[in-house]
Amino acid sequence: MRKIKKFKIPIYSYEILRKSRKAGADLGSVGLDNDRDFKEYVSQLASAIEPAVVFGYFPTDDPDTAVLSYRDKKPLTIAMLTLGNAIYEKTCDETDEARKTVIITAVSVFAASATKVISDIASQEAIPEGFELSEPFYIYSCPEQTRLSINAGKKDNSSMPLFSIEQEEERNDLNDQEMTLYRDDLTRALFRRLEAGKIGMSLDGNSIMPKYSSIFAFEWIVRKNRQNR
């Protein structure tokens, strides 16, 4: 298990601006339609985040991650990421809808940037072994990223199923509550195994705290040049 606290992430102000406009935020009404003013506001938001992560390697036969198995099961690196409490409190305190939209959009972009940093770090363990990491797939995310559903049938081209087709057929008699229990059991196991409390993450009933947190995994994939040998 590895732990990294208060690591640096790139801040993509233009991406936040583009997505905020796409989300319908009236930036002119709050004086954020100027690129310079918007960038300054995003910098203020970035100063309120405290990225922290724990992550670790899970082999193909790990019993706690059996729920994540695929038709061709692979080893996994699983990470638990939080952006801290302050940025969520900032969202709650904001009364203007346009600014609130910008904050939530910024948090989503910050989290994606942090995930990329984590991927680059975790890859340093995989590459010497002849592997590379897949794109992340999300077990939990707030705000919601491109994310898998607990039901494999709800996948799209940009996310990976939580269960393989065979498993989904075996479990098609389960209701939503029973399916949720699979994810809850996995979440509790990951909190314990990755010692998420060391970065301030906790379970409040079925809620993950701090609110702006995520749990995601990378598959270990054999590198193409190794496959061709």
Question: Where would I find each of the regions flagged by the language model?
Answer:
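General structural feature for long, well-ordered alpha-helical segments within catalytic domains
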Residues: 37, 41-45, 114, 122, ...
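Short secondary-structure junctions and interdomain/linker hinges
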Residues: 45-56, 109, 113, 117, ...
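Active-site helix-to-loop segments that bind/position phosphate- or nucleotide-bearing substrates
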Residues: 1-99, 210-212, 217-218, 227
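Catalytic cores of large soluble enzymes that bind and process phosphate-bearing ligands
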Residues: 30-37, 103-106, 110, 114, ...
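Short terminal or interdomain "cap/linker" segment that borders an active site or interface and mediates
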Residues: 129-229
